[in-house]
């Protein structure tokens, strides 16, 4: 390769695969300019089509797709500016070659071969412009149609979620109302039991008085009294057993109400997140309020900033089973436990726990 070829290759270097001029002539220069402009337009058209394809692959994330499209268009605009600057530089060199050739030819008008080449170049340029404009209009129409379909699908999904949340809330209200009725019946039974115990105590007092009289009687009366006392002790044992069972029932009912409080708070948070509102504090599985020393959780970023120790304390408090060897799921499990299940929360990417914690 000659030194002149190396100089031309270095001067007209490009990343579009367009072959530099073979010689310093107006014909070769115009051939290179025509090929370079066509390749640049194809490159820009390919970038816009890629942006539309990225938009179609992310139908469920409208905001992210629009951001991707905006970035792609910005890159296309930057590339367009770069290619325009390069094209201006190349055109200046080719025009200089043309002025040199016109000076050498010293003719009043361009030669026939030049007019013929210019006519073919203008015709090809107009065809490329029309084709590029048509493809761009088609891409715009297709992108607009896809965006309308995304909006309709997102609106439909949101209505379905609202209906489902409303149904779950009504079911929880009905279950809570039923539990309150059961608690009311249990309290009534406890009142009756207390009344019976008061009557039993009165009878016991009367029985003790009679026992004092019976002690003054014969040994036979003592034996009969011992038998009666044994029977009474059996009755007391049975009453204590019943009382223990009632305490167990009360404990089970308390745990059930605590679980319902946690579920109601979590469902309320799910509804609040659907309207992009911060959540409220969810009581623990046993009904206790989270430790005031623990960081408050009102949004998905609060969970991401938790330390490993605080995250495990929250998971244990809500009764969530977790794998100690797989810490990547801890924050996602905690987000579901407190009701952070909106589309933004589900798409949020958690950072790993810091090794210094």
From Swiss-Prot:
* A GO CC term attached to the entry: nucleoplasm
User: Where does this protein reside within or beyond the cell?
Assistant: Nucleus
Provide the primary localization: nucleus
Q: Which UniProt keywords apply?
A: Meiosis, Nucleus
Give all cystine bridges in this chain. Answer: none
Origin superkingdom: Eukaryota
Would I find Nucleus among this entry's keywords?
Answer: yes
InterPro entries recorded: Mug135-like_C
Any one GO biological process: meiotic cell cycle
Tell me its family: Belongs to the UPF0612 family.
Q: Per its database record, what is this protein's job?
A: Has a role in meiosis.
Report what the protein is called.
Meiotically up-regulated gene 135 protein
The species is: Schizosaccharomyces pombe (strain 972 / ATCC 24843) (Fission yeast)
Q: Which gene encodes it?
A: mug135
């Amino acid at each position: 390769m000659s030194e002149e070829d190396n100089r031309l290759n270095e001067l007209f270097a490009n990343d579009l695969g367009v072959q530099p001029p073979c010689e310093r002539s107006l014909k070769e220069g115009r051939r290179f300019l025509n090929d370079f402009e066509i390749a640049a337009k194809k490159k820009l058209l390919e970038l816009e089509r890629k942006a539309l394809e990225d938009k179609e692959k992310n139908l469920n994330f409208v905001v992210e797709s629009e951001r991707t499209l905006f970035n792609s268009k910005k890159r296309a605009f930057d590339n367009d500016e770069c290619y325009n600057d390069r094209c201006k530089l190349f055109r200046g060199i080719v025009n200089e070659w043309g002025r040199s050739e016109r000076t050498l030819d010293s003719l009043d008008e361009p030669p026939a071969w030049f007019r013929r080449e210019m006519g073919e170049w203008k015709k090809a340029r107009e065809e490329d412009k029309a084709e590029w404009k048509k493809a761009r209009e088609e891409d715009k129409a297709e992108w607009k149609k896809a965006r309308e379909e995304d909006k309709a699908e997102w609106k439909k999904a949101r209505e379905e979620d609202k209906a489902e949340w409303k149904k779950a809330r009504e079911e929880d209200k009905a279950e809570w109302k039923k539990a309150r009725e059961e608690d009311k019946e249990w309290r009534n039974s406890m009142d009756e039991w207390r009344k019976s115990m008061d009557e039993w105590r009165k009878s016991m007092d009367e029985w003790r008085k009679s026992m004092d009289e019976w002690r003054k009687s014969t040994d036979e009366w003592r034996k009969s009294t011992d038998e009666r006392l044994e029977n009474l002790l059996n009755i007391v044992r049975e009453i204590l057993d019943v009382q223990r069972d009632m305490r167990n029932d009360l404990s089970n009912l308390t745990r059930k109400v605590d679980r319902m409080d946690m579920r109601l708070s979590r469902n309320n948070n799910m509804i609040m997140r659907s309207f992009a509102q911060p959540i409220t504090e969810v009581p623990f599985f046993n009904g206790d309020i989270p430790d005031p020393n623990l960081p408050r959780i009102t949004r998905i970023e609060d969970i991401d900033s938790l330390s490993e120790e605080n995250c495990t304390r929250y998971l244990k408090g809500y009764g969530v089973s977790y794998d100690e060897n797989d810490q990547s799921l801890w924050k996602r499990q905690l987000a579901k436990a407190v009701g952070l299940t909106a589309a933004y929360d589900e798409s949020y990417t958690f950072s790993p726990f810091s090794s210094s914690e």
